[in-house]
From Swiss-Prot:
Cellular location(s): Host membrane
Pfam families, per database record: Secretin (PF00263), Secretin_N (PF03958)
Gene Ontology CC terms: host cell membrane; membrane
Keyword Membrane: yes
Function: May play a role in phage assembly.
Keywords of this entry: Host membrane, Membrane, Signal, Transmembrane, Transmembrane helix
Signal peptide: 1-20
InterPro entries reported in the protein's UniProt record: GspD/PilQ (IPR001775), NolW-like (IPR005644), NolW-like_sf (IPR038591), T2SS/T3SS_dom (IPR004846), Type_IV_pilus_biogenesis (IPR051808)
Topology term for the membrane: Single-pass type I membrane protein
GO biological process, any: protein secretion
Protein name per Swiss-Prot or TrEMBL: Putative assembly protein ORF430
Bilayer-crossing regions: 226-245
PANTHER family linked to this entry: DNA UTILIZATION PROTEIN HOFQ, PROTEIN TRANSPORT PROTEIN HOFQ
Length: 430
């Protein structure tokens, strides 16, 4: 065999003129076809890949034959087919191609025999909770690889119904898919208490971000420090009991240590966002050209956006976005105040019924006032001794309490070991 290959290669080497004229002259008896094809292809300037089923021997006897004709005759006489893939010829045995086509015909016949048109059943199925389009898409991907004449699934978006024309044997699978995904989406109610409290009051409560949390006998541990801009120091923690939040806020307001800004309850579906916005638009004048002016507005608001995801253990993962934009009149330019922005974006896991508290967004309020003793303060000369002007600068912290609850869940909120003692808390601090 090796001698035959060497002899064939030498026969090609002895016809250098063939490269210029693109004609082939070669004569050889019984050489392995897997050797002959690449040699002829190389002489003709072609790249080939041989299929694994190609085998046998071939005799070559070409006398000044065009190269392309010689190559085609070599393939045809040995029942081989070629197909171009890019710049490469893929050579395949004709029997292999015929077998593949025969298998495809057999599969088509099998489908026709399996799903005769008379076996097609037609039904209208109403989808209650899920999207009919999603049901059809999922079923087609999973179960309808055996397509057949007469089979179809269409959707009526108006009634959220599926019109199915399928073999009877397919409907149990379709019903199982519908039963699995056509379920009501659970709802989550998130009670939010947005509080603006003095920093002194927060310190009296023992609120310390970035470590342990304690409000009297309230107790929690923060989930970790957050990376925020310098000067923000935003943090969060969990409270073990929420039964006396109302009393806590009432005492705060009665002592003048803060106020409840907003108390919204956001109701949303699992994996759906909900938001609340409270703010104002600040008017200012701007040039409109040709010396004219127009009134424009800057938006300053407190916004809260949440997206709950219910976990299998009935805890709730919440994506939280808190944003507070407030005007900074002390740095106003031509009467137009810049907008100071504080923003917190985080994801936290909260057990059903427990409270997470977010804080660390600060603002400063400057207050000026005066007091005097009636009558005496009006006496010239000595009256000024009975007057007093006051300038108070106080820093406030924005605290946001979030309590998520899964609607319809009968499980009691998880309790921690330390329980809030209202009498001790109010007696010591207020």
């Amino acid at each position: 065999m090796i001698r035959s290959i060497i002899a064939l290669m030498l026969s090609f080497a002895l016809v250098p003129f063939a490269f210029a004229s693109d004609r082939l002259t070669v004569k050889h008896h019984e050489i392995d076809i897997r050797v002959a094809i690449p040699l002829v292809a190389d002489f003709c300037g072609r790249s080939v890949v041989l299929g694994p089923s190609i085998q046998g021997v071939v005799s070559l006897d070409f006398d000044d034959v065009p190269c392309s004709q010689a190559f085609d005759l070599l393939l045809e006489s040995n029942h081989l087919l070629s197909s171009m893939v890019g710049d490469v010829l893929v050579i395949t045995a004709m029997d292999q191609v015929l077998n593949s086509e025969r298998k495809a015909d057999d599969l088509r016949t099998f489908r026709r025999d399996l799903f005769n048109a008379n076996d097609i059943e037609r039904r209208v199925i109403n989808i209650v909770h899920a999207s009919a389009s999603e049901v059809v898409s999922l079923f087609k991907e999973s179960f309808m690889s055996l397509d057949a004449p007469g089979m179809s699934m269409t959707v009526d978006e108006r009634t959220n119904s599926v019109f199915a024309a399928l073999p009877s044997s397919f409907f149990p699978a379709l019903e199982s898919v519908i039963q699995a995904i056509d379920v009501p989406v659970r709802q989550v109610a998130i009670e939010a208490n947005v509080v603006e409290a003095s920093v002194d009051w927060s310190k009296r409560l023992g609120l310390n971000w970035g470590g342990a949390l304690s409000l009297g006998n309230w107790s929690a541990v923060t989930a970790g420090d957050l990376s925020v801009a310098a000067g923000s120091s935003i943090g969060f923690g969990f409270l073990s009991n929420t039964l006396s939040l109302d009393g806590l806020f009432t005492a705060m307001e009665n002592e003048g240590n803060g106020r409840v800004v907003s108390r919204p309850t956001l109701l949303t579906l699992d994996r759906q966002s909900a938001s609340v916005l409270r703010g104002t638009e600040l008017p200012y004048q701007q040039s409109a050209g040709d010396g004219a002016t127009s009134v424009a507005f800057k938006h300053a608001a407190l916004s809260l956006e949440v997206k709950p995801v219910i976990s299998p253990d009935n805890s709730i993962v919440i994506e939280v976005l808190v944003s507070r934009d407030s005007p900074n009149f002390s740095n106003a330019i031509d009467g137009v105040p810049p907008i100071d922005t504080n923003r917190l974006v985080t994801t936290i896991r909260v057990p059903h019924g427990q409270t997470v508290v977010l804080g660390g967004v600060y603002s400063t309020i400057n207050q000026q006032g005066s007091s005097r003793v009636s009558g005496i303060s009006r006496i010239p000369g000595i009256g000024r001794l009975f007057k007093k002007k006051e300038h108070v600068t106080e820093q406030y912290e924005l605290l946001i309490f979030l309590t998520p609850r899964i609607l319809g869940l009968e499980v009691e909120p998880e309790k921690q070991s330390l329980v809030f003692d209202e009498s001790f808390f109010l007696g010591d601090l207020f």
